[in-house]
Amino acid sequence: TDGRSFDAKVVGTDAPSDLAVLKVDGSNLQTLPLADSEKVRVGDVVLAFGNPLGIGQTVTMGIVSAKGRATAVGPANDSYQDFIQTDAPINEGNSGGALVNTQGELIGINSQILSPSGGNIGIGFAIPANMAHNVMTQLIDHGNVRRGLLGVSVQAVTPDIARSLHLDNA
């Protein structure tokens, strides 16, 4: 908001988490302390910062609606499945903005909305700060994110599957 502009160097990107680490050389840059996002509780008051629809910086208020939410968005639906859900309005342009608790600590990074119209209907998702910190650390240390892969997927057991596996019920 002070009108300064900086060039940034891309340190690393991670498509599955939709996160990147950028290096900016500057002075008097403000930072946010990271909260332990595991300690976030449903009902906690949160503030969502961003630039919705390109109108300029804004802050909206809401609560944490749920934790551990999954979305079906991302390359081959492989996006992380541990989002913080909030009803703080997150609209197009808020992605990458901060989701902050009332102590001014970063609890998440605004990432997605779930909406049939593309506008906010009170279902927004943020990447938890702990996950973002893990991705950031790996990008800085290794240039990429290392993940384990089991080669297993989960699906509901339907009556047809139950019969094929000789199960008593689905």
Regions found by a protein language model. Give the residues of each.
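Serine-dependent protease modules
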Residues: T1-A170
